[in-house]
Amino acid sequence: MYCLQWLLPVLLIPKPLNPALWFSHSMFMGFYLLSFLLERKPCTICALVFLGALFLICYSCWGNCFLYHCSASELPEAAHDPAVVGT
């Protein structure tokens, strides 16, 4: 389970508030995970635990999934602030 210490913090990286940056963020995270899995080759148990956690986070649609934005979840309140979106 040593390899999980490099995978689990990835789930804690927040999604950007600006909706225009969601695609770039999801591409970066996807390429990071792919390169990590190819380079470090974590054990099967660690990979399954991480993919299970990622599936549960994305399936719950709490807005924490970095792969896509759930249509049922609302935007954060700060996303409607022009000072935040304009940055």
From Swiss-Prot:
Compartments it resides in: Cytoplasm; Nucleus; Membrane
The keyword Glycoprotein is annotated on this UniProt entry: no
Lineage: superkingdom: Eukaryota
Nucleus in keyword set: yes
Major subcellular location class: cytoplasm
Keyword entries, A-Z: Cytoplasm, Membrane, Nucleus, Transmembrane, Transmembrane helix, Tumor suppressor
Membrane topology classification: Multi-pass membrane protein
Residues annotated as transmembrane: 19-39, 43-63
InterPro entries: BCALP (IPR009598)
Xref: Pfam families: BC10 (PF06726)
Gene Ontology cellular-component annotations: cytoplasm; membrane; nucleus
Primary role: Acts as a tumor suppressor; induces growth arrest at G(1)/S checkpoint and apoptosis via RB1-dependent and p53/TP53- and NF-kappa-B-independent mechanisms. Modulates expression of genes involved in the regulation of proliferation, cell cycle and apoptosis.
Recorded family membership: Belongs to the BLCAP family.
Protein name per the record: Apoptosis inducing factor BLCAP A
